[in-house]
Amino acid sequence: MEFKAFIEITRPHNCLLAGIVGVLGSIVAAGGLPELKTAILVFLVVFLGCAGGNTINDYFDYEIDKINRPERPLPRGAMSRKAALWYSVALFATGIVLAWFINIWDFLLAIVAYVTMFIYAWKLKPMPFIGNVVVASLTGATPLYGAIAVGEIGLAGTLALCAFLVNVAREVIKDIEDIEGDMAKGAKTLPILIGRKRAAYVGALFAILTVVASFLPIKAGIGLGYLAMLPVDAVILYSAFLILRSQDRETAHRAQILLKVSVFLAVVAFLIASLVR
C-alpha cells in the first residue's frame, strides 16, 4: 500500500478547486469577505466532501477503472478497496463534524450532499442522464453552500444555476469520453443509449443554456461587472463547438476539461461582478 495513494485517490486538485468555489460563493453572496473562521470551515467541509466522494466513487468503480483509468490507485494495487471504503467514511465523518460549527443549515446540507455522493457512486452513476444530473446538482450546490454560511444568496443563486447547467454538459461529454469502458461494464449511459452524436447535441445544448443563464445578472442591474463573464461564455461555447465537431475520446476529453475550467472562471467572473457593481 502506497501512502501517496491516500492523497492521489481524492483527486486533491479537484477538491482544492471545489473548496475555493465554496468560499468564493460566500464572497459572491455577501459582496465582501466572510469571517476567516467561516471561510476556513466552508473550504474544509467542501474539500472533505469532494475527497470522500472521489474515494467512494473509485471504490465502486474498481472494475470499470481497470479499463478507463488503470493508472488510479485501486486498479494498480496501490490501495486496497477496503482501505478506500473506510477512508471515505473517515473523510465524510470529519466533514460533517466541521459543518456543525458553521450553522444548522450547512450542517444538514452537508449530510444530504455526502449521502447523495454515496448513493450516486453506489447506484445512480450507471443510470442514463440521472447520474449526470446528480453530479451537476452537487457541483451547483457548492457556491450555495458558501452562500448559506453567510446567510445570503445574492448572485450565488445565478452562479449555482450556471454551475449546474455547465456540469450537466460536462458529465454527458465525460460519458462520451468513457464510452468504451462503460460499455464493457454494461453501463447504460446516455451516449450508449442514444449514440455519441446525439449525446453531443445534449451536452452542447446544456452548454448553450449555461451561456443564456449567465445573462440573468444583467436583469438584476449588475452593470459593467458582467463583462468579466464574456470570456467564460466564449470558452463554454468553444467546448460545445468541439464536441459537435467530433466525438472521439481525445476531443471529448479536451471539451470536458475546458468546461471544468470554465466553472472556476465563472466563479471568478461572478466575484468580480459582485464587487464592482
Swiss-Prot record:
InterPro entries: DGGGP_synth (IPR023547), Prenyltransferase_related (IPR050475), UbiA_prenyltransferase (IPR000537), UbiA_sf (IPR044878). It comes from the Archaea. GO terms for molecular function: geranylgeranylglycerol-phosphate geranylgeranyltransferase activity; magnesium ion binding. It holds the Pfam family UbiA. GO terms for biological process: glycerophospholipid biosynthetic process. Its cofactor is Mg(2+). Prenyltransferase that catalyzes the transfer of the geranylgeranyl moiety of geranylgeranyl diphosphate (GGPP) to the C2 hydroxyl of (S)-3-O-geranylgeranylglyceryl phosphate (GGGP). This reaction is the second ether-bond-formation step in the biosynthesis of archaeal membrane lipids. Belongs to the UbiA prenyltransferase family. DGGGP synthase subfamily. This is Digeranylgeranylglyceryl phosphate synthase. The lineage of its organism: Archaea, Methanobacteriati, Methanobacteriota, Thermococci, Thermococcales.
